[in-house]
């Protein structure tokens, strides 16, 4: 079982490897805004739990288990960003909101949000209807 902190590291490592082909402790530390020694400790724990293989001074690679969860975590993050865009959350708030909620949702909830995103993507009319409801509610709230 992973903790939210472990998930943040696995997600970041997965993204770095996808983007650059590798992930170094210094890259992870910079991306997560943490001290390299904190990264080393977590990487050692993730190695022990078989999410990755870490060799000091040589770098790290994700195991199949680590790749699988990394891919799923990136999907979750991107899906939640997409969902918040669809429902009209201000762009500058989306990243922080996703970071605040992603670890607190079950995978069942994530799958249902995925269904809802698909529902809106399948018909532009649905998004138009949602925006009309939001506009009406904003006007009602301003009048109150």
Curated annotation (Swiss-Prot):
| Keywords carried by this UniProt record | Activator, Cytoplasm, DNA-binding, Manganese, Metal-binding, Repressor, Transcription, Transcription regulation
Annotated GO MF terms: DNA binding; DNA-binding transcription factor activity; manganese ion binding; protein dimerization activity
Q: Tell me, which GO biological process terms does this entry list?
A: intracellular manganese ion homeostasis
Q: Where does Mn(2+) 1 bind?
A: 8, 99, 102-103
Q: Which Pfam families does this UniProt record tie to the protein?
A: Fe_dep_repr_C (PF02742), Fe_dep_repress (PF01325)
One Gene Ontology cellular component term attached to this UniProt record is: cytoplasm
Show where the HTH dtxR-type domain sits: 1-63
Residues recorded as binding Mn(2+) 2, renumbered to this chain, are 11, 77, 99, 102
Per its UniProt record, what InterPro entries does this chain match?
DtxR_MntR_Metal-Reg, Fe_dep_repressor, Fe_dep_repressor_sf, HTH_DTXR, HTH_tscrpt_reg_MntR, Iron_dep_repressor, WH-like_DNA-bd_sf, WH_DNA-bd_sf
Q: Where in the cell is it found?
A: Cytoplasm
Q: How is its activity regulated?
A: DNA binding is strongly activated by Mn(2+).
Q: Which domain of life is it from?
A: Bacteria
Family, as annotated? Belongs to the DtxR/MntR family.
UniProt subunit comment:
Homodimer.
Q: Which NCBIfam families match?
A: PRK03902.1
What does it do?
A: Central regulator of manganese homeostasis.
Name of protein: HTH-type transcriptional regulator MntR
Species of origin: Bacillus pumilus (strain SAFR-032)
Q: Which gene encodes it?
A: mntR
